[in-house]
Amino acid sequence: MFAGLPSLSHEQQQKAVERIQELMSQGMSSGQAIAQVADELRATHTGERIVARFEDEDE
């Protein structure tokens, strides 16, 4: 379970996707780009936060 994940509006999600695509177009791997954008969001987000739980479906 992860607590304190930023709750993003559709517009904020779209901007995050565009930022990831920009970083990838500059040669960054998708994993690195996602991690960097996630770090940026956590550092700058001032809105609500959600609690999320991720489970492996393979298990």
UniProtKB/Swiss-Prot annotation:
Coiled coil, from the record: none
Domain of life: Bacteria
Pfam family, one: UPF0181
Family: Belongs to the UPF0181 family.
Cited HAMAP family: UPF0181 (MF_00507)
Protein name: UPF0181 protein CKO_01169
Species: Citrobacter koseri (strain ATCC BAA-895 / CDC 4225-83 / SGSC4696)
